[in-house]
């Protein structure tokens, strides 16, 4: 029987020798694939797709059928936890995620209940079990959650935001309420990732999409502290499950992030991979960091830029190739194949 620990992805995460650099793609199950669009249309809307384990399983498997990827990522949304807390998640056409009951004052934060994660988000764990059963046995499955800070941003703003005025006002003027909210979310995220691990995921990733809007001290206090808490609790219970942290626009804080006890850091395209490796490569693996815009260019440009990312990381293990953020819906599927082939062809020379 195949030992999943021998997979390229898990070996690279643990900084063990590999024959080539593993690759997966953030949002690899997504709107750039015509087969995904067909299933989403059948589901009626994005949330129905997330809440239907069979359909979530199908779209998770689609990119694996099309491409030689080294891991699958559970198909879900980062806002399932706030939805389970009763905020009423919905997706407005062209606007992204919104809540019918955003947290409009400190009273709402005090009243917010920590949900029973196994019951309220059972559809996520059912999907994870089904995916693990149906997907290739030799490939790892990645589970994920939004970070407490990122979830709080959406919950207080009521959806996406350009300036995050409400949540930033909260941390400056109602510090205690902000910490109460983040603590409730940290407890929920820990329970959520624990249940995903029980359902069969082989690694977990915490997406801190909005950590980069904070000052350094506020990042430490309101984002990193809670991710640290989650990592410690997961590692206490599941020391062998790798944890990846990703703060978008957080390249200046890699040293702090590496101190949390996580196994790897995701880096976006604004971060120089060679200097990131010098700074924290002795402690953690690095995942990234091709600019997603490269996938909208021609074959020779894609190959050149893939080569640049691989050369920037350099020789040896500890690198998982990925984009610096999620793949965009306008990417031609054939360009993804060009990127993956380039990683397969160019990376072995760095692992001799």
Curated annotation (Swiss-Prot):
GO terms for biological process: protoporphyrinogen IX biosynthetic process from glutamate. Pathway: Porphyrin-containing compound metabolism; protoporphyrin-IX biosynthesis; coproporphyrinogen-III from 5-aminolevulinate: step 4/4. Coiled coil: none annotated. It is found in: Cytoplasm. Belongs to the uroporphyrinogen decarboxylase family. The gene is hemE. Substrate binds at residues 27-31, 77, 154, 209, 325. It comes from Legionella pneumophila (strain Paris). This is Uroporphyrinogen decarboxylase. InterPro entries: UROD/MetE-like_sf, Uroporphyrinogen_deCO2ase_HemE, Uroporphyrinogen_deCOase. Its EC number is 4.1.1.37. CDD domains: URO-D. GO terms for molecular function: uroporphyrinogen decarboxylase activity. GO terms for cellular component: cytosol. Its main location: cytoplasm. It is an enzyme of class 4 (lyase).
């Amino acid at each position: 029987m195949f030992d999943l620990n021998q997979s390229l992805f898990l070996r690279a995460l643990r900084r063990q020798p590999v024959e080539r650099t593993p690759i997966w793609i953030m949002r690899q199950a997504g709107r750039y694939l015509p087969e995904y669009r067909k299933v989403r249309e059948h589901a009626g809307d994005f949330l129905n797709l997330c809440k239907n384990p069979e359909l979530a399983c199908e779209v998770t498997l689609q990119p694996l059928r099309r491409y030689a990827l080294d891991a699958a990522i559970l198909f879900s949304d980062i806002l399932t936890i706030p939805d389970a807390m009763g905020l009423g998640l919905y997706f407005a056409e062209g606007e992204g995620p919104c809540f019918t009951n955003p947290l409009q004052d400190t009273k709402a934060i005090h009243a917010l209940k920590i949900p029973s994660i196994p019951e309220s988000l059972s559809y996520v764990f059912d999907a994870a079990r089904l995916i693990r059963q149906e997907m290739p046995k030799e490939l790892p499955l990645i589970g994920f959650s939004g970070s407490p800070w990122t979830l709080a941003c959406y919950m207080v703003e009521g959806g996406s935001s350009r300036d995050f005025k409400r949540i930033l006002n909260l941390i400056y003027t109602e510090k205690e309420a902000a910490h109460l909210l983040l603590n409730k979310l940290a407890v929920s995220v820990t329970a959520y990732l624990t249940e995903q691990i029980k359902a069969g995921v082989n690694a977990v990733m915490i997406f801190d999409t909005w950590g980069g809007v904070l000052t350094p001290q506020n990042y430490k206090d309101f984002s990193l502290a809670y991710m640290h808490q989650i990592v410690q609790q997961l590692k206490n219970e599941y020391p062998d499950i790798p944890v990846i942290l990703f703060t978008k626009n957080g390249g200046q804080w890699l040293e702090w992030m590496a101190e949390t006890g996580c196994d790897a850091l995701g880096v976006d395209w604004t971060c120089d991979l060679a200097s990131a490796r010098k700074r924290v490569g002795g402690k953690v693996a690095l995942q990234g960091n091709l600019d997603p815009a490269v996938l909208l260019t021609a074959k020779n440009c894609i190959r050149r830029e893939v080569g640049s990312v691989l050369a920037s990381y350099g020789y040896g293990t500890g690198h998982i190739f990925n984009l610096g953020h999620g793949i965009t819906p306008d990417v031609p599927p054939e360009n993804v194949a060009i990127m993956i082939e380039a990683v397969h062809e160019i990376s072995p020379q760095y692992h001799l």
